[in-house]
Amino acid sequence: MRLVPLVWAYIEMTTMRIISKGNSDRGLEVDLSTKLGQLELPAPSLSASGCAASGKELSQFMNLADIGAIVTKSILLEPRSGRATPRMAETPSGMLNSIGLQGPGIDQFIEDDLKWLEKNQVRTIVSIAGNNAEEFGRIAGKLRKVGENVVGIEVNISCPNVANRGLVFACQPESAHEVISIVRRTIGGSYPIFAKLSPDVTDIVSIAKAVVDAGASGVSVINTLLGMVIDTQLMKPALAGVTGGLSGPAIRPVSVRA
């Protein structure tokens, strides 16, 4: 797993704070605070969902309380074992992953991971996923009474490596609207909700409008692109699941265009 970009961002932020502190007597200050909809963060750097699980992996490299927030790996209602291995394959400008939403389920996640994050005072955005709209609502309901360190929810309606492609809600405005509406009704008020959009659509703007109309505070753009890598030694797909989600520098121009 490549941690260089996030670690480098942390180094840059730390350096800016040191410079600011060292020159405070000269009236020089650096304000890194960022506002995402209703959500106010002290710094603009967030981890991408999936890259750091619940954040424990990154804690050996940095103080997680120094970045804007940790975005957790997407959590389902029930535990899931995920896909067979191999699950990851490197590409020239990124990597493919085919994890299959492996996770402990929301109850165990709250008991173990969220307690650890709260203990370490880590601002957290919990990413949630579901097999149907009702499941999204049930997970959101369980997050209503968690600690104050949970500052928002990312609603993953676009994971491209789930075996049944029929469950990708982000491909249609109507289904995307339905999921966000249920989450908003369940969580209530102006609590920050961000819809994670899929690049595998012909009109991402219509999807974005639908989720905002349904109550989303903003959108997370973009999820991985579906791809495949061939193992030229074995002459077969490198991933056990055949296809996987492409992430990394290769998809940045696609995200910017969206």
Regions found by a protein language model. Give the residues of each.
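N-terminal capping/small domains of soluble enzymes
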Residues: I11-T124, A129-N131
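N-terminal active-site wall of soluble small-molecule enzyme domains
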Residues: T34, Q38, E135, T202-I204
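Short, conserved acidic/polar surface loops in the N-terminal third of protein domains
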Residues: S81-T85, I110, F136-I139, R165-L167
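Alpha/beta enzyme core
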Residues: G137-A258
